[in-house]
Design a protein with these regions (language model features):
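Bacterial N-terminal signal peptides
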Residues: 6-16
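Short, cysteine/histidine-rich loop/knuckle motifs that typically chelate Zn2+
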Residues: 159
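Cys/His-rich metal-chelating microdomains
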Residues: 163
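Positively charged n-region of N-terminal signal peptides that target proteins for export
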Residues: 1-4
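Bacterial signal peptide processing site
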Residues: 17-23
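Extracytoplasmic c-type cytochrome modules immediately beyond a signal peptide or single-pass transmembrane anchor
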Residues: 23-156, 166-209
Length: 209
């Protein structure tokens, strides 16, 4: 039972920054941003873009698995509040490692940031103004591919992101210490928490030379 509880909390902590991927509607139309990036519907992706999409999702899954494993270890040895420190100090390093291994840029962002360093990349800024609730895909003339994957809050995530009065005192104190300007509270189950973003380069086979 203890192992199950630890794994449950670890998944809960990660799912507060994880994502559920939703398909875009068939009516989604292609549009261009000022930076050259174009929104593109999933059902119009060419074979190369479909491969890039799979790489983006695989990178997100790899980050999920690695951080979940680390959080489970911390919860077992140090308790739930210690997971807050891991999210601050180790999650960025883990994301960088996954990005290097998968040859992508990957990160997390939100319109209500907990960590002010989780700002969106330039190509995502204008798209996020509309707070997309479905997965969004973009392409660039130079062959790059990008994805924004929404984060839906699960019930167990309320331990760290719910109304302030419902957050356990030790977790609340850890949040105050680590994130004095925290804005990521007051959520309810099912709320849009934020987004994973992934940028995939042009496949090597298509690079000029």
């Amino acid at each position: 039972m203890r192992v199950l509880a630890i794994m449950f909390f670890a998944v809960a902590v990660f799912n507060c920054v994880g994502c559920s991927i939703e398909k875009p509607t068939a009516s989604q139309q292609e549009s261009k941003s000022s930076s050259g990036w174009s929104l593109v519907a999933e059902d119009t992706l060419n074979p190369t873009q479909q491969l890039q999409q799979k790489i983006a999702v695989a990178a997100r899954e790899a980050l999920f698995e690695r951080l979940m494993k680390r959080l489970a270890a911390v919860v077992e040895t140090e308790g739930p509040a210690a997971a807050i420190a891991v999210c601050q100090s180790e999650a960025p390093t883990i994301a960088q490692a996954v990005g290097h291994e998968k040859n992508v840029r990957i990160g997390r962002t939100s319109d209500k940031l907990r960590n002010s360093k989780n700002q969106p990349p330039e190509w995502a800024v204008s798209v996020l103004k509309d707070r997309p609730t479905q997965a969004v895909f973009l392409t660039h003339p130079d062959g790059r591919f990008a994805a924004l994957l929404p984060v839906r809050l699960k019930a167990q995530c309320l331990t760290c992101h719910g109304p302030i009065e419902s957050i356990p005192m030790d977790v609340r104190q850890a949040l105050l210490q680590r994130y004095p300007e925290d804005r990521a509270i007051g959520y309810a189950e099912g709320d849009l928490r934020g987004w994973f973003w992934v940028e995939v380069p042009k496949p090597p086979a298509e690079t000029g030379g």
